[in-house]
């Protein structure tokens, strides 16, 4: 039985981390083997707080050893990683990816390098950003950063589309084959913008921006999950990007019109299979030097 190993946070209530990623991948036809880096009652934006704890790096390694014992690693189609709770967890992930690639050289590694955002800066514990930037992102086949995380990896500021393209090209030169920028803030103009960069081309996607009273959490996790599933279906990066963009819009639309804060992942599940709305993807023409 083939599957996707998803190593990220988990909440009991709502949809963030694995709670946002696992079901969409299952709905798109994939077995998913979740390993949680933290387990909380709810996401951390609730003013009432949250309960739960982070797991030790050894907890991750122990579960991966167990999967190896039953021969599951050679059947692993992809490793998807998101929020990591410690620098040591990043090292456990690095070791896990190496083990999976050794067991199945065709397995993908998709890294969602959760670090922060332009308005918040770096929000992760000491050592995590460094390990993401120097260890996990360079070894990934696909990275799914936001604009802030891309700027950190490319070691440059991003203020325009041209800047973002240059940053993506720098990122591709460091190892990844695909860069999906899950939110390009510098183009804010009433639309939500995403950018895809591969060696074959660069593509821009725009969709209407919903004016939520409180921004839903877990959207980036959802984007990474749908995109990973699309690639594993054998779609080209552009096709997976198109599907991911349209499906995410459908979930956000359902969430907005329901007046909810938590993503309406279950109610909008048909979007993962057949998005209800289609937005054209624009290929960005690169200026020749």
From Swiss-Prot:
<feature type="binding site">
    <location>
        <position position="182"/>
    </location>
    <ligand>
        <name>ATP</name>
    </ligand>
</feature>
<dbReference type="GO" id="GO:0008478">
    <property type="term" value="F:pyridoxal kinase activity"/>
</dbReference>
<keyword id="KW-0460">Magnesium</keyword>
<keyword id="KW-0067">ATP-binding</keyword>
<dbReference type="Pfam" id="PF08543">
    <property type="entry name" value="Phos_pyr_kin"/>
</dbReference>
<feature type="binding site">
    <location>
        <position position="112"/>
    </location>
    <ligand>
        <name>ATP</name>
    </ligand>
</feature>
<dbReference type="InterPro" id="IPR023685">
    <property type="entry name" value="Pyridoxal_kinase_PdxY"/>
</dbReference>
<feature type="binding site">
    <location>
        <position position="221"/>
    </location>
    <ligand>
        <name>substrate</name>
    </ligand>
</feature>
<feature type="binding site">
    <location>
        <position position="149"/>
    </location>
    <ligand>
        <name>ATP</name>
    </ligand>
</feature>
<comment type="function">
    <text>Pyridoxal kinase involved in the salvage pathway of pyridoxal 5'-phosphate (PLP). Catalyzes the phosphorylation of pyridoxal to PLP.</text>
</comment>
<dbReference type="GO" id="GO:0005829">
    <property type="term" value="C:cytosol"/>
</dbReference>
<dbReference type="InterPro" id="IPR029056">
    <property type="entry name" value="Ribokinase-like"/>
</dbReference>
<keyword id="KW-0418">Kinase</keyword>
<protein>
    <recommendedName>
        <fullName>Pyridoxal kinase PdxY</fullName>
        <ecNumber>2.7.1.35</ecNumber>
    </recommendedName>
</protein>
<comment type="pathway">
    <text>Cofactor metabolism; pyridoxal 5'-phosphate salvage; pyridoxal 5'-phosphate from pyridoxal: step 1/1.</text>
</comment>
<dbReference type="GO" id="GO:0000287">
    <property type="term" value="F:magnesium ion binding"/>
</dbReference>
<dbReference type="InterPro" id="IPR004625">
    <property type="entry name" value="PyrdxlKinase"/>
</dbReference>
<keyword id="KW-0547">Nucleotide-binding</keyword>
<dbReference type="GO" id="GO:0005524">
    <property type="term" value="F:ATP binding"/>
</dbReference>
<feature type="binding site">
    <location>
        <begin position="44"/>
        <end position="45"/>
    </location>
    <ligand>
        <name>substrate</name>
    </ligand>
</feature>
<dbReference type="GO" id="GO:0009443">
    <property type="term" value="P:pyridoxal 5'-phosphate salvage"/>
</dbReference>
<keyword id="KW-0808">Transferase</keyword>
<feature type="binding site">
    <location>
        <position position="144"/>
    </location>
    <ligand>
        <name>ATP</name>
    </ligand>
</feature>
<feature type="binding site">
    <location>
        <position position="9"/>
    </location>
    <ligand>
        <name>substrate</name>
    </ligand>
</feature>
<comment type="similarity">
    <text>Belongs to the pyridoxine kinase family. PdxY subfamily.</text>
</comment>
<dbReference type="InterPro" id="IPR013749">
    <property type="entry name" value="PM/HMP-P_kinase-1"/>
</dbReference>
<comment type="subunit">
    <text>Homodimer.</text>
</comment>
């Amino acid at each position: 039985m083939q599957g996707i190993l998803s190593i990220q946070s988990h909440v009991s209530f709502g949809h963030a981390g694995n709670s946002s990623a696992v079901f969409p991948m299952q709905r798109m036809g994939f077995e998913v083997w979740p390993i949680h880096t933290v387990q909380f009652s709810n996401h951390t934006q609730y003013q009432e707080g949250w309960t739960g704890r982070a797991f030790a790096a050894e907890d991750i390694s122990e579960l991966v050893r167990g999967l190896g014992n039953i021969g599951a690693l050679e059947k692993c189609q992809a490793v998807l990683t998101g929020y990591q709770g410690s620098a040591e967890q990043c090292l456990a992930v690095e070791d896990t990816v190496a083990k999976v690639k050794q067991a199945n050289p065709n397995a993908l590694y998709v890294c969602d390098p959760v670090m922060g955002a332009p308005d918040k800066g770096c929000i992760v514990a000491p050592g995590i950003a460094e390990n993401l930037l120097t260890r996990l992102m360079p070894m990934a086949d696909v990275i799914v950063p936001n604009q802030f995380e891309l700027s950190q990896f490319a070691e440059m500021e991003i203020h325009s589309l041209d800047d973002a393209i240059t940053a993506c090209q720098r990122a591709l030169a460091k190892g990844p084959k695909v860069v999906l920028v899950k939110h390009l803030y510098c183009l804010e103009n009433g639309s939500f913008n995403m950018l895809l960069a591969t060696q074959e081309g660069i593509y821009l996607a725009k969709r209407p921006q919903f004016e939520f009273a409180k921004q839903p959490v877990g959207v980036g996790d959802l984007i990474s999950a749908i995109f990973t599933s699309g690639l594993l279906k054998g779609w080209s990066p552009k096709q997976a990007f198109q599907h991911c963009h349209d499906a995410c819009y459908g979930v956000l639309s359902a969430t907005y019109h329901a007046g909810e804060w938590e993503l309406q992942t279950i109610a909008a599940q048909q979007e993962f299979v057949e998005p209800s709305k289609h937005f054209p993807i624009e290929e960005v023409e690169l200026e020749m030097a």
